[in-house]
């Protein structure tokens, strides 16, 4: 039986390649791992019934990006929130049994209506899978949002992530 939630320690193990087997999906290691835990993952959940992932990221003023983006005007780069959503789609594909290493393939649309600053306490990512392909091509297509302290500030449509075997990447 698959787990439906993962701790930070388990996410680190995934980053070392210990969760889905050698050559399969891995999360990045910190500081590029952009969430602290997956609080819910479901194969048939979400608004499209194709899968759902929800993860949380505890925001602290000492996070690495606040010191350099920007000096005197600290804000989490929007691309890091977007990357977190790609990370979660890739995790979902590995969790679902897809073979290969994850690669972001694109996004249809991204909309930012707010920012993550050091005074934010928690970011929540919510990913709704729209399509999951598990053939020679392993790919997930999803919509995602980022909530900062309960308010949606990033919205994405058609996040695309594929899993690729070494032969496919050659």
Swiss-Prot record:
One cellular component term (GO) for this entry is:
cytoplasm
- Which Pfam family would be a valid example here? FabA
The record places the active site at 69
Q: Which UniProt keywords apply?
A: Cytoplasm, Fatty acid biosynthesis, Fatty acid metabolism, Isomerase, Lipid biosynthesis, Lipid metabolism, Lyase
Q: Name one GO molecular function term.
A: trans-2-decenoyl-acyl-carrier-protein isomerase activity
InterPro entries with a match to the protein in the record? FabA (IPR010083), FabA_FabZ (IPR013114), HotDog_dom_sf (IPR029069)
Q: Where in the cell is it found?
A: Cytoplasm
Q: Which reaction does it catalyse?
A: a (3R)-hydroxyacyl-[ACP] = a (2E)-enoyl-[ACP] + H2O; (3R)-hydroxydecanoyl-[ACP] = (2E)-decenoyl-[ACP] + H2O; (2E)-decenoyl-[ACP] = (3Z)-decenoyl-[ACP]
- What processes in GO biological process is this protein linked to? unsaturated fatty acid biosynthetic process
What are the EC numbers?
4.2.1.59, 5.3.3.14
Pathway participation? Lipid metabolism; fatty acid biosynthesis
Spell out the Gene3D superfamilies in the cross-references: Hotdog Thioesterase
What job does the chain carry out? Answer: Necessary for the introduction of cis unsaturation into fatty acids. Catalyzes the dehydration of (3R)-3-hydroxydecanoyl-ACP to E-(2)-decenoyl-ACP and then its isomerization to Z-(3)-decenoyl-ACP. Can catalyze the dehydratase reaction for beta-hydroxyacyl-ACPs with saturated chain lengths up to 16:0, being most active on intermediate chain length.
Instruction: Please describe the quaternary structure of this protein.
Output: Homodimer.
Q: Report the sequence similarity comment from the record.
A: Belongs to the thioester dehydratase family. FabA subfamily.
- This chain belongs to the protein called 3-hydroxydecanoyl-[acyl-carrier-protein] dehydratase
Species name: Caulobacter vibrioides (strain NA1000 / CB15N) (Caulobacter crescentus)
What gene codes for this chain?
fabA
């Amino acid at each position: 039986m698959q787990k439906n939630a993962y701790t930070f320690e388990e996410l680190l193990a995934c980053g070392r390649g210990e969760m889905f087997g050698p050559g399969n999906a891995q999360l990045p290691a910190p500081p590029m791992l952009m969430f602290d835990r997956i609080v819910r993952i479901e194969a048939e959940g979400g608004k499209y019934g194709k899968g759902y992932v929800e993860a949380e990221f505890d925001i602290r003023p000492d996070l690495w990006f606040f010191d350099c983006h920007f000096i005197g005007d600290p804000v989490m780069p929007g691309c890091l929130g977007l990357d977190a959503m790609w990370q979660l789609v890739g995790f979902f594909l590995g969790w679902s049994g897809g073979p290969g290493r994850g690669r972001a393939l694109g996004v249809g649309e991204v909309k930012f209506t707010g920012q993550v600053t050091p005074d934010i306490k928690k970011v929540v990512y919510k990913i709704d899978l729209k399509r999951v392909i598990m053939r020679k091509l392993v790919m997930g297509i999803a919509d995602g949002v980022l909530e900062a302290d309960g308010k949606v500030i990033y919205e994405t449509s058609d996040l695309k992530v594929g899993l690729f075997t070494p032969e496919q990447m050659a």
